[in-house]
Amino acid sequence: MESEPLYKLKAEFFKTLAHPARIRILELLVERDRSVGELLSSDVGLESSNLSQQLGVLRRAGVVAARRDGNAMIYSIAAPDIAELLAVARKVLARVLSDRVAVLEDLRAGGSAT
């Protein structure tokens, strides 16, 4: 059986992350482990059923882990690398946005913005 090329696996991984709610969930879980109730009250912007669906996607991808604590399910990031990935994404985005602001400012000033 032929295995999937690594680039396809990477693309699937990034597709898992390609949803604003999932990114927000991960940002909250990087701070600390949380129950579904805590996530709902943390301005995730999702209804309970949609939150459960998004957590399921993240669990199946191995990005978050869950454990039972009494009646509550407690979610956490599955590996510290997830926190690093989010931090790198933030740095890249800040640089990209900074470059765009510089071009916009140049255009407003009447420059040639090359």
Curated annotation (Swiss-Prot):
GO annotation, cellular component aspect: plasma membrane
The keyword Membrane belongs to this UniProt entry's keyword annotation: no
GO molecular function, one term: DNA-binding transcription factor activity
Biotech uses: This protein serves as an immunogenic antigen, inducing gamma-interferon responses in whole-blood cultures from M.tuberculosis-exposed adults in Uganda, The Gambia and South Africa, indicating this might be a good vaccine candidate.
DNA-binding stretch(es), residue numbering of this chain: 37-60
InterPro entries (alphabetical): ArsR-like_HTH (IPR011991), HTH_ArsR_DNA-bd_dom (IPR001845), Metal_resp_trans_reg (IPR051011), WH-like_DNA-bd_sf (IPR036388), WH_DNA-bd_sf (IPR036390)
Domain HTH arsR-type: 2-97
Domain of life: Bacteria
Induction: A member of the dormancy regulon. Induced in response to reduced oxygen tension (hypoxia), low levels of nitric oxide (NO) and carbon monoxide (CO). It is hoped that this regulon will give insight into the latent, or dormant phase of infection.
Keyword annotations of the record: DNA-binding, Transcription, Transcription regulation
Protein name: Uncharacterized HTH-type transcriptional regulator Rv0081
